[in-house]
Curated annotation (Swiss-Prot):
It comes from the Eukaryota. The keyword Glycoprotein applies. This is Proline-rich receptor-like protein kinase PERK3. It comes from Arabidopsis thaliana. Expressed at low levels in inflorescence bolt, flower buds, siliques, roots, seedlings and leaves. Residues 1-123 are extracellular. The gene is PERK3.
Amino acid sequence: MARSNRCVPQNSSIVQIPIEEVFKTQLKSRWQQITMSSASSPPPPQVFVPEPLFSEPPPPPKAPVNVSLSPPPPPRSPSTSTPPRLGNRNPPPPASPSGQEPTTPTMTPGFSLSPPSPSRLSTGAVVGISIGGGVFVLTLIFFLCKKKRPRDDKALPAPIGLVLGIHQSTFTYGELARATNKFSEANLLGEGGFGFVYKGILNNGNEVAVKQLKVGSAQGEKEFQAEVNIISQIHHRNLVSLVGYCIAGAQRLLVYEFVPNNTLEFHLHGKGRPTMEWSLRLKIAVSSSKGLSYLHENCNPKIIHRDIKAANILIDFKFEAKVADFGLAKIALDTNTHVSTRVMGTFGYLAPEYAASGKLTEKSDVYSFGVVLLELITGRRPVDANNVYADDSLVDWARPLLVQALEESNFEGLADIKLNNEYDREEMARMVACAAACVRYTARRRPRMDQVVRVLEGNISPSDLNQGITPGHSNTVSVRLDARAVRVKPHGEMDSRWGRFKRTAQRYGGDSL
């Protein structure tokens, strides 16, 4: 095809390029074919945004099929549009007379060949990634927080335990160590056959009593937990409540409520303490007997305390008694049999059959409570450490005086001289009768604790404490002195009185003390 030698003026807006008639005919025919093909075929998917059609710069000229040329900037009139390229089938573009390549405007036959705008896809992807990432981060934080819970005192053994119940909880060894100032002597409240008791203050400010059992106990973890699970269900106003426990390696710790006004031993035998008046002594006797009776009569299975003593009877500010330290009590699985166990307890409170053979029943607790009643009556300790009286124990010293007091209603030799005879004689007679019945030598002749409670409260007669005697037929608690306890006396007066004590016992058919 011959090129035109005419030059295009630079200042003209549109320059018409003359071409041969044949080229015009072919171009017109091709354009009609493209138009008919576009009309017959379905329209392409609308994946473009038509707005930027005239705002974008025109592409480089590669298919100069338009009959007119326009200098940049490109015209905005749609009449200057040309059909798209048809590949190699397009005719070669005409050359300008000056040898320069002609400029071809943008072609828009109803669709764009440029890539689709990614605006909508990018928004959806960002939203999806944000939600997924947020869920992943939250899940990761949850597991990290659960895994990295604070641990108390890594140097201490790791605690093991099960939740006791709704009102109880487990404690770590570190928590109890901090609560008791590392079990310091300043926090030591007392020491018994089972271990040491410390005062502690928990993180919430509550005061507790922490009992640290002696290491080396043969009691296994399952046995300990089973026993603790039972006593955790016991709730009585005259029993110290169990708060929780801790098992850490070989360590066994019990956590009890803290009773602020010390123990009966402190108030009764403490050095420099004022004399406890009689009404308070009776109140303590009644309330403590109720707590012990609950263990024996209302628990199923019944619970044997094994270490009833003045030091385990706590006093609140109203002088109500709470029986403590039953956390190591022996559970009697059969009410008709005894439990053979290693002797545990405090000398001076042990029942004869328990100390001799280890045979344990609830009547062993009854004997120990009788010793506590003798302490309240006499003001003496259960064992004479200073050898003030010749007998080895308070019970041995009190046996003959108990009979005299019951027969003659003479309590001067038995009652605490610090009371200065300031006591109710009827109340004293009831307490003496209970003490005498509780410390009987034969276990089966001792009364039940519910009987002791009713006698102390004045609801039944002291004669109902007698075994084998119809209630109401006797006005005296039948007793017989153990000859061994009497004949060790250095004074002949005791031996001379033995005959009268023996005749009294035979008259009422009683049993030995």
